[in-house]
């Protein structure tokens, strides 16, 4: 197996071997002709040839040398070696340029195909009022306009949400109520009334002004009231409790912003006008708070 190796001046192994063979051939020709010239010079010096005869002899030697070199040129083409090498380089350059041109055309074709695909998807996502024309510039212009409109809408919604959060104060007292009889969160009040002849339940849809939870243990009641802060609200509630026969044993007040949480520990006296039940006391407490708010 013949391996291709790098030789000086860009020649291959085959070309180098041919060159060596040609050099040997040239050397033999030159040596033989040198001997002929030397013999002729000796004969000239001895025979005193004229200069015209010497010139004719040199011409004949050149012609003879050319005739000997002709078969070698026909066999190896040594005269056209450099021209063939240049031609191969030129042909290689032309092929490389053609390949680059074809690659560039293929890349450009794929790029346009992808661009058209993306534009069709973009157009399908736009409203009809923004995607009427079919040219690429109009589709991109409509998309930009639509995105600007969405951005303005988003900023407006964010401003509304921020204003809503500022207006709505978080109810930090929501965990204080387990089973309230009245709750502003549901805005539903359940009132239980008892008559002297029989007991039955009445569900009324009332205006809930406070969260009220009442827990009864015999004749002692734990009352929690969460409502909007109002001047002299605590004083008015205590006076109403006393008039109903509810003695205040302990109380606690906690405020946060515009809300107040009242915690009462009361005793239902014997002369109390209310039935000692959680629902009855809750109804009365809520009615007291609602009446106090109306007196403002």
UniProtKB/Swiss-Prot annotation:
Tissue-by-tissue expression: Expressed constitutively in roots, stems, and flowers.
Xref: CDD domains: bHLH_AtFAMA_like
GO cellular component: nucleus
Induction, per UniProt: Repressed by heat treatment.
Any one Gene Ontology molecular-function term assigned to this protein's record: protein dimerization activity
Family matches, as Pfam families: bHLH-TF_ACT-like_plant, HLH
Alphabetical keyword list: DNA-binding, Nucleus, Transcription, Transcription regulation
Biological process, per Gene Ontology: regulation of DNA-templated transcription
SMART domains: HLH
Record protein name field: Transcription factor bHLH99
Source species: Arabidopsis thaliana
